[in-house]
């Protein structure tokens, strides 16, 4: 209850300051399109074996080799909100992708692909946020431009059902009998980076207008990268299986580096308080 009262009082203070031109408060809310591309470069265990084979066949030398990499692309309908208070702004977009478009080499996904795993996603979400500093150009005119830049934080969670052909390969190592009847893959990735926001605003009244926003962020600092599987055993019991390596509950040890780009375009209702 105290938190609710505090939020109401804080919002009331902001409105009061805005009314006396002490604080400039504006923003927009609307629908748009989101494109998210995730690039992952993996550590390559083949390099050591290839170097040994070449040395035996050709003689001692140095080997340079491209590391395997994959690109996962997502297109989504997005909801977005931007709030600007004086020179500080916050921008968040939430996208709902329905398909994944993978290209390149994903060592963890090759077996699933061979079994006919679908690229259709279920209950997946991309949350892309940005906070930073920005200014309004031509602020006093009905048509003005907002330009800002700052820190971006992105979280993506994708889910897909794995094919029955693959589930049937999960068998008891002793009896050879199937032990699972359903399996779903979940990927969870969080990253941070830097980005910018540009918006063209047109106010047809003093406080209400329309806005076209462009938000683009490059992510290069990994925060979390997990891939796990949920399913049902043959007796109906639910289970969760997390890929591990060297006793770590993630796949970071398989990844050399990764980066991502998120682009969001939005047509929105603009407002000023």
Language model feature labels by segment:
Residues 201-273:
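Predominantly the C-terminal beta-signal and adjacent terminal strand-loop region
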Residues 79-174, 266-273:
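Gram-negative (and chloroplast) outer-membrane scaffold detector with strong preference
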Residues 39-69, 98-124, 155-189, 224-256:
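Flexible, solvent-exposed loop segments that connect beta-strands
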Residues 24-26, 89, 142-146, 199, ...:
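Membrane-spanning beta-strand positions in outer-membrane beta-barrel proteins
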Residues 72-80, 124-130, 191-195, 260-264:
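Transmembrane beta-barrel architecture of outer-membrane proteins
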Residues 33-37, 75, 90-92, 119, ...:
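Polar/charged side chains located within well-ordered beta-strands of beta-rich proteins
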Residues 1-24:
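Cleavable N-terminal export/targeting peptides
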Residues 19-86, 262-272:
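Short glycine/proline- and aromatic-enriched beta-strand/turn motifs that initiate or cap beta-hairpins
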């Amino acid at each position: 209850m105290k938190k609710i009262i505090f939020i109401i009082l804080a919002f009331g203070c902001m409105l009061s300051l805005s009314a006396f031109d002490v604080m400039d408060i504006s923003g927009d809310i609307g629908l748009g399109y989101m494109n998210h591309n995730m690039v992952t470069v993996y550590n390559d265990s083949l390099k050591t074996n290839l170097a040994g084979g070449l040395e035996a066949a050709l003689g001692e030398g140095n080997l340079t080799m491209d590391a395997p990499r994959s690109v996962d692309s997502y297109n989504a309908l997005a909801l977005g909100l931007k709030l600007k208070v004086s020179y500080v702004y916050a921008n968040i977009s939430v996208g709902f992708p329905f398909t994944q478009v993978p290209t390149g080499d994903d060592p963890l996904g090759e077996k699933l692909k061979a079994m006919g795993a679908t690229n259709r996603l279920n209950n997946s979400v991309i949350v892309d946020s940005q906070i930073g500093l920005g200014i309004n150009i031509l602020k006093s005119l009905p048509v003005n431009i907002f330009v800002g830049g700052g820190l971006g934080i992105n979280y993506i969670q994708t889910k897909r059902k794995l094919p029955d052909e693959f589930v049937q390969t999960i068998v008891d190592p002793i009896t050879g009998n199937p032990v699972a009847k359903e399996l779903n893959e979940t990927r969870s990735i969080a990253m941070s980076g830097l980005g910018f926001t540009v918006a063209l605003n047109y106010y047809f009244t003093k406080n209400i207008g329309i806005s076209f926003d462009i938000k683009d962020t490059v992510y290069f600092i990994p925060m979390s990268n997990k891939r796990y599987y949920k399913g049902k055993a043959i007796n109906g019991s639910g289970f969760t299986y997390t890929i591990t390596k060297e006793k770590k509950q993630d796949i970071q040890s398989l990844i050399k580096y990764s980066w991502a780009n998120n682009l969001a375009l939005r047509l929105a209702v603009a407002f000023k308080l």
